[in-house]
Amino acid sequence: MQQLLTGKIRLVETAVKTKATSANVHFRRSVLAAEIADRLCEEPTFGHVKMEKMLFLTERLCHIDIGSHYHRDAAGPYDNRALRSIDSQLKKQKWFEVRRTEKGNRYVPMQNRGKHKAYFDKYYSAVLPTFDKIIDTFKTQNTERCEIVATLYSAWEDLLHSNKPFTDADIVNEVLNNWHESKKRISKERWLSAIQWMRENGFAPNV
């Protein structure tokens, strides 16, 4: 009986710990998004889609877990549930509010803008150089450019996980034929050029 009680207590403790850890991941994800918004909200190119791509690239290149589950969307790797959660948390904390405009959704600063920074420094100081590089590189880039890099990164990473040999042409084929029809609006040459740029600038996946 004592063993059963002990086991039960352990189960309860584990459940509580798991719940707390999950909540912490969601908060850390919102803190990261707040820093991205803080740095990019004045840029005319920054909105919902670019936020998603910056989160994806940061998660992958900084090797951090923010509880995202991406799927292949028209605009690249996308996690709609996570983005809705982030938008809700940003507004709850009064850091940023998403407003729909003629040019799409914009992140508008609220009265507590900047108060996330203590948390950001706590959670992400170890990856700050890589994070800074991502933000500085894509700060003024248009949404399509961010979409191209994020999409290639995801397709490239998937091929690496397959443990089979592949070429740059295979990466592009994965994007053009196994992703979304809208990807075909971008020329094969442009995809190949972007792969080379990613290698030269340190944005290639390394699994």
Language model regions located:
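Conserved, aromatic- and glycine-enriched, well-ordered alpha/beta core segments
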Residues: 20-149, 156-207
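Amphipathic alpha-helical coiled-coil/heptad-repeat segments
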Residues: 1-24
